């Protein structure tokens, strides 16, 4: 799960737990703006990501990277104030996949079996 998905999960849990007749929490919002980059990447993207009163801003070469980095900053702020308790973030490079291998020709992770050779 990435940072954007984590914040969407937090929002969905808030929506599901809100009482009928009350205002639902505002969903995470984001906006992009092109900014001047450098010689290697002439145009970069600035993303402003807002959720639960916190805002994260990031400038990266792609929109996806900018959105993830901005969402990460919001997650860090929420974590500081204990608002992410009960939620877990597992990234592909975390220790959860320590013994798994990734085959670039496939779009999924697979676990090494006993018949596979050890690398």
UniProtKB/Swiss-Prot annotation:
Keyword terms: Apoptosis, G0/G1 host cell cycle checkpoint dysregulation by virus, Host mitochondrion, Host nucleus, Host-virus interaction, Modulation of host cell apoptosis by virus, Modulation of host cell cycle by virus, RNA-binding
One Pfam family here: Dicer_dimer
Record CDD domains: DSRM_SF
Example of a GO cellular component annotation carried by this entry: host cell nucleolus
Localization, UniProt: Host nucleus, Host nucleolus; Host mitochondrion
Top-level lineage group: Viruses
Protein name: Non-structural protein 3b
Organism from which the protein derives: Bat coronavirus HKU5 (BtCoV)
């Amino acid at each position: 799960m990435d940072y954007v998905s984590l914040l969407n999960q937090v929002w969905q849990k808030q929506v599901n737990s809100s009482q009928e007749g009350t205002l639902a929490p505002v969903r995470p919002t984001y906006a992009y703006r092109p900014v001047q980059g450098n010689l290697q990447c002439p145009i970069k993207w600035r993303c402003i990501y807002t959720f639960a009163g916190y805002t994260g801003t990031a400038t990266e070469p792609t929109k996806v990277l900018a959105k993830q980095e901005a969402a990460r900053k919001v997650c860090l702020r929420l974590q500081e104030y204990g608002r992410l308790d009960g939620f877990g973030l597992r990234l592909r490079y975390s220790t959860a996949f320590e013994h798994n291998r990734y085959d670039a020709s496939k779009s999924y992770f697979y676990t090494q079996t006993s018949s596979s050779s050890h690398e």
